[in-house]
């Protein structure tokens, strides 16, 4: 199941995994906290800043909200077009929702362009990301080409509603990312625990050697009558 879920990951998950692996779990010796710059500022490049933005969970949540909002716009427009919400509605109302949907799609187009610029070939390594981009581009083209058609949603309403699948992909991507982060931290904690156990065993050995040395020195002192035996 985990192998299937990994196909739903978004671009940038590999970058986040590397970042998590670089986190040090310091228990033996603590260091003074350092003032580290924000990842967006520390990227030192526009492409790096875009990678951080597209990989952040807050951005994924914004995308989920926009996808749901866009689907609601489309659903309302379909219902208005089929005259299910009201028998008579102003002709301008469906157009308003249509343009609202186009505005959200325009943001998705910019998102795809930004991902292509930031991740380049890595973008095409995620099949569902490519499929998602194809759905958005096709929906955007259809909306623009048939912008004056009143019966557009009778034919392509379901196609546009397919964008709802992005919610499942993004949510699954977040789940897989959190799971991977937890597994990596557990692995590092286990390694750190083994290291600490080795240090404890080494310290116990040193203590035993010191106790033996103390006994030897006490015996030597007693032999030279430095102090009487207890």
Curated annotation (Swiss-Prot):
Residues 1-58, 120-127, 177-230 are cytoplasmic. Pfam families: Ion_trans. One of its GO terms (molecular function) is voltage-gated proton channel activity. Keywords: Cell membrane, Coiled coil, Ion channel, Ion transport, Membrane, Transmembrane, Transmembrane helix, Transport, Voltage-gated channel. One of its GO terms (cellular component) is monoatomic ion channel complex. SUPFAM superfamilies: Voltage-gated potassium channels. Residues 177-226 form a coiled coil. It is a multi-pass membrane protein. Residues 80-96, 149-155 are extracellular. One of its GO terms (biological process) is proton transmembrane transport. It is found in: Membrane; Cell membrane. The chain crosses the membrane at residues 59-79, 97-119, 128-148, 156-176. Mediates the voltage-dependent proton permeability of excitable membranes. Forms a proton-selective channel through which protons may pass in accordance with their electrochemical gradient. Belongs to the hydrogen channel family. Homodimer. The segment S4 is probably the voltage-sensor and is characterized by a series of positively charged amino acids at every third position. Unlike other voltage-gated ion channels it lacks the pore domain. This is Voltage-gated hydrogen channel 1. It comes from Xenopus tropicalis (Western clawed frog).
């Amino acid at each position: 199941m985990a192998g299937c879920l990994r196909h739903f990951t978004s671009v940038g998950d590999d970058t986040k995994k590397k970042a998590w692996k670089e986190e040090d779990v310091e228990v033996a010796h603590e260091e003074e906290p350092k003032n580290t710059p924000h990842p967006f500022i520390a990227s030192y490049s526009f492409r790096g800043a875009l990678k951080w933005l597209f990989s952040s969970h807050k951005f994924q949540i914004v995308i989920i909200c926009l996808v749901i909002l866009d689907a609601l716009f489309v659903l309302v427009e379909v219902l208005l077009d089929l005259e299910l919400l009201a028998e008579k509605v102003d002709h301008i109302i469906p157009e308003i929702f249509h343009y609202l949907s186009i505005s959200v799609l325009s943001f998705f187009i910019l998102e795809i362009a930004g991902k292509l610029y930031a991740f380049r070939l890595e973008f095409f390594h995620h099949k569902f990301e490519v499929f998602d981009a194809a759905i958005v581009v096709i929906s955007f083209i259809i909306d623009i080409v048939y912008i004056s058609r009143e019966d557009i949603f009778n034919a392509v309403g379901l196609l546009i509603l397919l964008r709802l699948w992005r919610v499942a992909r993004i949510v699954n991507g977040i789940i897989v990312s959190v799971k991977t982060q937890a597994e990596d931290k557990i692995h590092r904690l286990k390694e750190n625990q083994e290291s600490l156990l080795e240090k404890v065993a080494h310290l116990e050995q040193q203590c035993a050697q010191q106790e033996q040395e103390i006994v030897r020195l006490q015996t030597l002192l007693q032999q030279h009558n430095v102090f009487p035996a207890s």
